[in-house]
């Protein structure tokens, strides 16, 4: 009976040992290699939101900015715009406005712009890593290079998407301004029309 129990427990012991060894030898995300491997894992799992923690800070902030502005913009459109513009424009902002946080905004863009597909095609094992201060470059065995920057918390963040996301955040801010001006105009016109109806012809 005891031998049978040992035979049953042996595979679990092997699995536990493998897990502990893997965990102990897996590079920290406070190294460029560790951050790169976590991005690779998330890409292979088709979960771009899972490597949001491994993009640089400016890109993360941009994702939150996009989501916040799109929520505000869509809300103003629904409040003040007349049809058919209200339904059309509200639908165009629906995805970003419906995102619960920056990681979901990032996932939307990663899929929409083909970033995930590109990473899946190009990513492979690490060949070499070059570090210069707070910047690093991870070169893969396929010859692709991935730039990283060390963030304030010590985690390395991929910089590939920063410029695009910052530009999109700036566009979201401009769009919000334009929509707010138009919404105010629509409300003013409705208010004037309402007063005219109440006062009647003179």
PLM region spans:
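Mixed-charge, polar/low-complexity N-terminal
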Residues: 18, 22-25, 29-30, 35-36, ...
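Short, low-complexity N-terminal intrinsically disordered segments enriched in polar/charged residues
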Residues: 8-77, 177-179, 200-201
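Short beta-strand edge/turn micro-motifs at domain boundaries
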Residues: 118, 124, 133-183, 187-188, ...
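Short, flexible helical or helix-coil boundary motifs
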Residues: 84, 96, 100, 112-113, ...
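Intrinsically disordered, low-complexity regions enriched in Ser/Pro/Gly/Gln/His and often acidic
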Residues: 11, 16, 108, 148-150
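Short solvent-exposed beta->alpha transition segments
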Residues: 48, 52-129
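Secondary-structure junction/capping motif
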Residues: 31, 100-105, 159, 200
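Twin-arginine (Tat) signal peptide motif
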Residues: 1-6
């Amino acid at each position: 009976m005891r031998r049978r129990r040992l035979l049953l427990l042996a595979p679990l012991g092997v699995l536990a040992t493998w897990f502990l060894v893997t965990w102990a030898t897996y590079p920290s995300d406070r190294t460029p290699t560790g951050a790169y491997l976590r991005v690779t894992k998330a890409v292979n799992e088709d979960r771009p939101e899972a490597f949001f923690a491994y993009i640089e800070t400016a890109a993360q902030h941009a994702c939150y900015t996009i989501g916040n502005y799109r929520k505000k913009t869509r809300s103003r459109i629904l409040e003040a715009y007349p049809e058919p513009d209200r339904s059309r424009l509200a639908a165009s902002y629906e995805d970003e406005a419906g995102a619960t946080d920056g990681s979901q905004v990032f996932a939307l863009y990663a899929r929409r712009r083909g970033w995930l597909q590109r990473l899946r095609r190009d990513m492979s094992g690490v060949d070499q890593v070059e570090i210069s201060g707070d910047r690093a470059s991870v070169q893969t065995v396929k010859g692709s290079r991935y730039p990283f920057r060390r963030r304030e918390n010590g985690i390395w963040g991929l910089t590939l998407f920063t410029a695009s996301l910052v530009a999109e955040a700036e566009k979201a801010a401009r769009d919000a301004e334009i929509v707010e001006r138009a919404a105010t105009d629509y409300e003013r016109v409705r208010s004037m029309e309402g007063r005219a109806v109440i006062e009647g012809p003179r």
